[in-house]
């Protein structure tokens, strides 16, 4: 559920930002600055980002689940924006200019030109956001101790086996099976992403 919400929010917020960066809506320098800012969550360790969010919003009354969504969105958002902005930059600006000359409004331009030509990039970006959110551990551990995602649950299982006492029904076979399922899931998603990328280039 968390990854789905983060993916939807990432798409809704990422498309406008990608257009602003790719088309230099506010000028060249602001676009360069925004593009550079997109790299920060990619460079900074996720646990550091999670801790900073926790300290910043601590005591604000925001529910842990909402804070977790915010943390995952901050981490995954740049991946979608960079993927989408690169796709938009490949679209000749003359197509949009011609459409605007004929009286098309910005949303019509997006719906008739940008969306059809970037649909595979949107889908591949969404897959990246989804898988990144599913696999995120550091920020989740930093933000909340009450909510557990699959990777955090596996970490807790491993700690219970190493430190003890082991949780009921949890052993090395259980942990191995859970890790194997996550790896299989990642492989399937990456394979789908690869096929989508090839289809988009065709």
Placement of each model-derived feature along the sequence:
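Hydrophobic alpha-helical bundles that form the membrane domains of multi-pass transporters
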Residues: 107-108, 117
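Short hydrophobic faces within alpha-helices
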Residues: 40, 94-102, 175
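Hydrophobic positions on the alpha-helical face of helix-turn-helix-like DNA-binding modules
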Residues: 98-99, 109, 113, 154
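Glycine-rich helix-loop "coupling/hinge" segments at transmembrane-helix boundaries
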Residues: 137-172
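Membrane-water interface segments at the C-terminal ends of transmembrane alpha-helices
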Residues: 1-89, 113, 117-137, 142-145, ...
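Structured catalytic cores of enzymes that bind and process phosphorylated ligands/cofactors
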Residues: 103, 152, 176-178
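Glycine/proline-centered hinge or cleavage motifs at structural transition points of membrane proteins
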Residues: 102-103, 116
